Amino acid sequence: MKVVNVPSNGREKFKKNWKFCVGTGRLGLALQKEYLDHLKLVQEKIGFRYIRGHGLLSDDVGIYREVEIDGEMKPFYNFTYIDRIVDSYLALNIRPFIEFGFMPKALASGDQTVFYWKGNVTPPKDYNKWRDLIVAVVSHFIERYGIEEVRTWLFEVWNEPNLVNFWKDANKQEYFKLYEVTARAVKSVDPHLQVGGPAICGGSDEWITDFLHFCAERRVPVDFVSRHAYTSKAPHKKTFEYYYQELELEPPEDMLEQFKTVRALIRQSPFPHLPLHITEYNTSYSPINPVHDTALNAAYIARILSEGGDYVDSFSYWTFSDVFEEMDVPKALFHGGFGLVALHSIPKPTFHAFTFFNALGDELLYRDGEMIVTRRKDGSIAAVLWNLVMEKGEGLTKEVQLVIPVSFSAVFIKRQIVNEQYGNAWRVWKQMGRPRFPSRQAVETLPSAQPHVMTEQRRATDGVIHLSIVLSKNEVTLIEIEQVRDETSTYVGLDDGEITSYSS
């Protein structure tokens, strides 16, 4: 059994950079009620600061159109939908992390598209019109929301241009041209606005180096570096509805190494102090991988949440909701979607893991690859432990003994558990027979799959509490230790022994 003696004082702060941003399906989905219901739930229970998604300039949001005037095609900018979308975000206390993409059809140089909703991934046929579009969009944001507000936003140029699926021919020099035109357009509106890139996925980190040298050589504005991080391998099985992918042997450490690698590249660049934003991360890059619905995903992500903030300025979970349509409209309630929240506002195990980390304090007392222990400002202790199990089979438990110093004698302990049994709506759905389009009754039942709660009162011995904890397979558990402020003596004539079946 592992024994951990938690120090009485922390020497550093727990960096909650995972709260900075969260991902979303294309922005046009924010016009749907269920999308906003999910975002409201996420903001109430977790509270992210920014939200990032594709499709700002795609045709369904409707910003860019061309109309014929006196025989000439001229741009027309329509902000009806984007105003509604951003208004909804701000009302839920979350700001946009703007991604400029994809290409409006009327401005596209080709017809190559990506996703069910056909985001165009070709360069603009007229860079002057593209520049004018960026200026118009940014200027409109400032006019509507005010310069001080928009200066807090971040503007990212495109999405994964190192992949041929997302940028025609994955042409690096063409992307650099797009970035330069876009960044200069943003800064022409206001030099204090924040713009960055190159928003690549893993496997092409030479893009980071080349991008920063390009910006230095041409004096192109760059305020941050962005990259994506996933750790699943190529699928070993594909079906009409699912991708099955193995994770790396030590996936959490692999992802953290990706964070460190990019940070090192930035330090070696002409801009060594630029912020690094991981604008997408998850276990799998596929929106139809069942791992996203599981307790394993929660245990995996717990490790990343515990340490990722030491290496990057933000890391944005992809995504908050299963209202998402890259691979068509979801074909079942649980379909392997990226979201923290499944359809019908049903929290997944990973959602609960995020709420557990949201309960942690700022003072970091202890951390290793399986737990994190913190102290809150009020002196209470909050810890998250996890047992990531990659192998198949039952059992596979882990025992831990924590020796935790406390400054009070009477102690209230609350433990919340998410694992293969508790807080696992995917398990309940499978027990129902995996209903593709569940009945209203089933939809009412599934949200009841909440974390298991255990409580007890103890007295500290010599200023410490000893906790023996057994973690089941893929469990994530939150332990909160607070001082008991006993008011029992204020109840005149109190005697539980007078209640049938109870003793004093």
Swiss-Prot record:
Keywords: Carbohydrate metabolism, Glycosidase, Hydrolase, Polysaccharide degradation, Xylan degradation
EC code: 3.2.1.37
Top-rank EC class of the record's enzyme: hydrolase
One Gene Ontology term of the molecular function aspect: xylan 1,4-beta-xylosidase activity
Active-site residue list: E160, E280
Reactions accelerated catalytically: Hydrolysis of (1->4)-beta-D-xylans, to remove successive D-xylose residues from the non-reducing termini
Claim: Phosphoprotein is one of the keywords in the record: no
GO biological process, one term: xylan catabolic process
SUPFAM superfamilies: (Trans)glycosidases, Glycosyl hydrolase domain
Taxonomic superkingdom: Bacteria
Pfam family, one: Glyco_hydro_39
Record-stated family: Belongs to the glycosyl hydrolase 39 family.
Protein name (Swiss-Prot/TrEMBL): Beta-xylosidase
